[in-house]
Amino acid sequence: MSQSPTASDSLLGIKPYRFVVDNDWYRGEAGIASFEPEELFGTKLRALLQRRKNRDLFDLHQGLEQLALDADKLIACFGHYLALEGNPITRAMAEQRMLEKLGRSLTEDVVPLLPADIRFDDAVALAAFGRVWKELIARIPGEGWKLAGSVVDALRQRGYPDLLKGAA
């Protein structure tokens, strides 16, 4: 099982951030130390590819939507933590694992955890899948999975007609 990064494992170092709380109950601020977003999301990508749960897909999608993530730095951090574990994931393995996720629901382990005003239905999940594939999976070094094309074609015929259209 994957473990969270520690400060000594960090590739990019620990960075200070200002944290502000301003609401009806409390107002205050503090300095906190944390990893850079690319490092945190690099471990999210690792988790997405190492476990069956898809909640990391939601998190990666949100990170790509809300933050100006440097995808190359994120992939470097992904590789760094895999190397620390001694458990590499090649691009071919990543593509295979991602496509296998489409054999089950992308949303069932996520939706119960979300606030009512956050929408993550099948259409949004499939768009998130495509974005993570195009912006992250396609950047993992190495050759792609040799069966990816035929698996994508089969999935398109089985209900995902726009799956990875225009993907690298």
What feature does the model see in each segment?
Residues 1-168:
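Structured mid-to-C-terminal alpha-helical surface segments
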